[in-house]
């Protein structure tokens, strides 16, 4: 009988942990916050890119490729690096033409159940084909994309199971602390 108890307890414990979609879900059940790591957010982004956006009435296609998310040590903002391609007049937009980097806070959006960029800033742009500098049209395209993306697209989406477990809780704030994204829960 004793031999059966230990395996049953272990199986129950593993099943309970597996039911939590992330380590942050355990915190939601036990505490007042959810925590997410940069690799968790990166995994979500990897499934959502590359993305193509037709701009200027379809004359130009902006392709945003290869997202790389990091949380710089001691920072309250995350960093997103992207490759970018511009397609026009037969040029393939999926061929990287350059790179840009964004710094941003995060906010929770109830409509998408996701973490969205909050007050993103375009930190750097490098387009070697333009001599390393970005012309006004290219910068405008990236800034328009960034505004649309921050408004409409999450960089991470909480799954239905996690949302069910925290349904009785209110999301008070989203911060970046000690290299992690922290969603603070209220009553």
Which sequence ranges carry the predicted segments?
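Extracellular/lumenal and peripheral-membrane lipid-interaction modules
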Residues: 20-187
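Sec-dependent bacterial lipoprotein signal peptides
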Residues: 1-20
């Amino acid at each position: 009988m004793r031999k059966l108890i230990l395996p049953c307890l272990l199986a129950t414990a593993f099943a309970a942990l597996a039911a939590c979609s992330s380590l942050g879900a355990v915190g939601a059940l036990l505490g007042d916050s959810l925590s997410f790591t940069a690799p968790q957010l990166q995994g979500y982004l990897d499934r959502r890119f590359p993305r193509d956006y037709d701009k200027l009435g379809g004359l130009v296609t902006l392709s945003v490729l290869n997202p790389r998310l990091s949380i710089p040590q001691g920072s309250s903002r995350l960093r997103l690096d992207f490759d970018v391609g511009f397609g026009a007049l037969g040029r393939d937009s999926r061929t990287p033409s350059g790179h840009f980097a964004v710094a941003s806070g995060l906010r929770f959006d109830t409509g998408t159940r996701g973490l969205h960029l909050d007050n993103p800033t375009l930190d750097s742009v490098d387009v070697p084909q333009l001599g390393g500098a970005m012309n006004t049209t290219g910068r405008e395209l990236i800034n328009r994309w960034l505004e649309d993306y921050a408004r409409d697209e999450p960089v991470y989406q909480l799954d239905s199971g996690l949302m069910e477990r925290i349904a009785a809780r209110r999301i008070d704030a989203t911060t970046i602390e000690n290299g992690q994204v922290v969603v603070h829960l209220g009553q």
